[in-house]
Every structure is written in C-alpha cells, then in structure tokens.
Amino acid sequence: MNSTPDASSRPSIRALTLLEGRVLGVLVEKQHTVPDSYPLSLNALTLGCNQKTGRAPVMNATEAEVLTAVDGLKRLSLVMEGSSSRVPRFEHNMNRVLGLPSQSAALLTILLLRGPQTAAELRLNSARLHGFADISSVEAFLDELAANDPPRVVKLARVPGERENRWMHLLCGEVSVSELAQPGDEDDSVPLSAFEAVKAEQKRLADEVSRLQTLVRRMAAELGIDAGDLTAGE
C-alpha cells in the first residue's frame, strides 16, 4: 500500500496552529485544482483560506495572519517560497516532509480543510485530488496513516445517530480521549447505505452550485448586467 520509503516512521513536528493547518491544506488543494496558478501568491492563498465552501470552520484571516502562518510552516520545511517571480509565491512540501504517498496526502488535505469526515465523505471530497476506487481503499490508507509513527490521523467515536465513524487529522495536536473510537465500536456498525452516499454527494453539489452562483453574480457585476440575464432560457 505504501509507496513512499520509510513513511511509517518520520521525525515528529510540533503541532500546527489551526491557520497553519489551513494554509497547508489550501496549498495542497490548489496544486491539484488550479495548477496554472500554483505556486500561490499571498493574496490567492488568503482567499483560499477564507473560502466559504469546502472549509470548516470558515475563517476570515488577514494577509498578515496568513503570512505569519506561512513563516511558521517554512521553519518546519512544510512550505517553500519560490524565487522566480517578483511576487512571492508559496508551495507546499508536505509529501516529502511527512513521507506521504499522494493518496494519503489527499485524505490528510481534506481533513485539514473540512474537519472530521467519514471514509465515504473523504472519498467524495477528495475526488479532485485523487480518485479512490472505493471506500475500502480510503479506509486502507486511513489505517496506514493511523499506524504511522507518529500517527497522522485518528478514528473518532461515532456520533449518536450516525452509522459511520469519522476520522480526524492529528497535525494540529491530539484530540480528547472522549472523542476517540473505542475497541468494539465498529462491531455493530452498519455499512454505509446508498442513501447516505447520495446525501453526501448532494451536499458536495450544493456547495459547488453556491460557488458557481457567486461567480455568476461577480461576472454580472463586472459586465454591468442583471445576473438573471446570464441564465435566461435555462
């Protein structure tokens, strides 16, 4: 499963701040989703951190705060600054520093950006970073991340009323004992139903529609026309 040498044992790094984790996640995400704009300028990085969709929690960080987070990540070698542009641009070095294959990096990135997720949610939300064949393959890489030394993710206790355990990254520190899954928690688990998978997909699509609507309104404002004219006849 592991395609990166010695990834199971890596030097531990200090716990990241919430904003450092967000910055790192944004850099990995944008490398895949907007490769033409990567590495990112400080402005683009700040916009990515403050995105309203695909982020939990939603932030309102300033460029100065983001730059402080970048400096902290640079000291850990997790972020590098390019020297080929007049405008400073930043790129991540997460895979090499943490010894992660691309599959594990994709899962860790979604956890950094969206918070706790089930394996099914991770498969849907990571599709633009890596296409997992099925939920079992997601779980295999999560188990591998949890078995790393130090562990990079942990399985959380199941939320009452939910059928699946969620997972959380550990790059920003340990989670409380009460949140951890206990041995035997999965014994009475019920496989994720098709209905639940559809609900997760509907949420993802709703987020995407919201993003596109915002883009349409912005374009309409720039063109000086009514936003409704852009969708007339649909």
UniProtKB/Swiss-Prot annotation:
Entries under Gene3D superfamilies matching the protein: Winged helix-like DNA-binding domain superfamily/Winged helix DNA-binding domain (1.10.10.10)
Disulfide bonding pattern of the chain: none
Xref: InterPro entries: DUF480, WH-like_DNA-bd_sf, WH_DNA-bd_sf
Family: Belongs to the UPF0502 family.
Protein name per its UniProtKB record: UPF0502 protein Bphyt_5265
Annotated organism of origin: Paraburkholderia phytofirmans (strain DSM 17436 / LMG 22146 / PsJN)
Source lineage: Bacteria, Pseudomonadati, Pseudomonadota, Betaproteobacteria, Burkholderiales
